[in-house]
Amino acid sequence: MTTVEQSLSGMSGAAGILDRERIIATAGFNRWLVPPAALCIHLCIGMAYGFSVFWLPLSRAIGLTAPKACPDMSLLQELFTTSCDWRVASMGWMFTLFFVLLGVSAAIWGGWLERVGPRKAGVVAACCWAGGLVLGALGVYVHQLWLTWLGAGVIGGIGLGLGYISPVSTLIKWFPDHRGMATGFAIAGFGGGAMIGAPLANLLINYFKTPTDVGVWQTFLAMAAIYFFFMMVGAFRYRLPPAGWQPDGWTPPSEAKSMITQHQVHLKDAHKTPQFWLIWAVLCLNVSAGIGVIGMASPMLQEIFGGKLIGHPELGFNALSADQKTIIAGIAAGFAGLLSLFNIGGRVFWASLSDYIGRKNTYYTFFILGIILYASAPMFAQMGNKALFVAAFCIILSMYGGGFATVPAYLADMFGTLFVGAIHGRLLTAWSTAGIVGPVVVNYIREFQLAAGVPRDHLYDFTMYILCAMLIGGLICNFLVKPVADKWYMKPEEVAALQAAHAKSDAAIKHGSFGIGKGGFDLPSLIFWCFVGIPLAWGVWKTLQAAAALF
């Protein structure tokens, strides 16, 4: 047991309210209260996608009206300077910290989460994410980039990892009949967090800024308080089903027909199977392709279409005036917002669809359709057809999000539900890898093409074919996924012993609807869904307003 785990165990001993045994559901509990609890946490940590909203204000934190630049400053000097403004590129490393630490922390503490339950993990995630923002605010206030990286990037990144995986196995256990849909709803929140957080951050920055302050550190503190409240609500609303519980009238699907195992694979063995590494590669390649596009969505649209975006098809990007470039930058921001919306919607749509067509077939769809769309994108650009180009990338980003939301159910199908949260945590190292590979491939190919004199409207053609090759690799890996060999399955007595250990005080009902099938949503569940749904609806509305500039 690590020092972190020992301290957390001590905390639970003093405050048994966080113990796993305290959150076993009793008869009458409505399982539809669990997805909005997960959304409370995911909508908060999803702001990681929207952190770029802080870069421009922070790039003039000292200069105020314009950046106080120090061109000869090294990155090491930049970490400690108090007299020069930070470069946007240096602050952009926050994204790398976020997603590397997300994967690493999920892998390290996934097993601990399975032992202690989602409530304690959710509370620790809230403390890390909100606490990281507080430390980041201090870094902004004293103008120390290293402190901002440590707070928001490292400590916040640990909160991202624990918060991201905290609901996964719980939702899969509550919804064995709709695994994909349940995880799709929760993980959609991570994609939707920036839709709420970015416009909220803008509002707060404008409220707090003064002639002598850009208003960012105050915004960090305000958002830390808001996020801590919402995440604690989510953590304390988590409930676990009694061991062995299943919905009334539900019959587990046939293993032979569905590739859904009724057995369990232990956490210590899952990574020894070829299935784990094949699914790891499937996720990594799907995410590498999509995340590269997300990072370059705005400049890509501007450079490919140039004056076509504002009714001047004869003008390329370099021929535009400064004012015209400002206008098309606003249009491109709407494109990025639209991609974000499809990223979220795809998480619910594709994960829910996977319950009917199967996880393997869903990933076949991602790769085959993705290859077609990436290969067609240069043709759409050459045709000057903005609508087809935008539609293609909206579908691509829906499958990017769908890949995240479908993979927990894929793992549960392969390895069972007993350790799926911890196995998913280890698999998220694929995301950490993709977070480096995808942007590097897209950005460096763009720079190479630019240096070679390739016209801006053709800068991304070769990139699209490289991304196609990635998806072909993912398609092959998905094809190779077969059911896990019998030798890796736990013996029935081992499973029974673990379930008994997890249910010390649980003599509760093994079967029952827990409110589902006999009325569906009740008033408490409806109120809780509104609690998370109203902020999300506001974020969608703000995104649609920004996207309207495209048309």
Protein language model regions, located:
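Symmetry-related core transmembrane helices of the 12-TM Major Facilitator Superfamily/SLC fold
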Residues: 217-237, 461-480
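Central cavity-lining transmembrane alpha-helices of secondary-active solute carriers
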Residues: 93-111, 337-350
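C-terminal ends and interior cores of transmembrane alpha-helices
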Residues: 127-141, 368-382
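Glycine-rich segments within core transmembrane alpha-helices of 12-TM secondary carriers
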Residues: 176-199, 425-439
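Intracellular juxtamembrane helix-capping segments at the cytosolic ends
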Residues: 58, 161-175, 182-183, 402-415
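Extracellular/periplasmic helix-loop-helix junction of adjacent transmembrane segments
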Residues: 54-104, 324-334
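Hydrophobic core of transmembrane alpha-helices in multi-pass small-molecule transporters
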Residues: 43, 132, 145-162, 284, ...
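Extracytoplasmic gate region of multi-pass secondary transporters
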Residues: 49-58, 268-350, 435-443, 447, ...
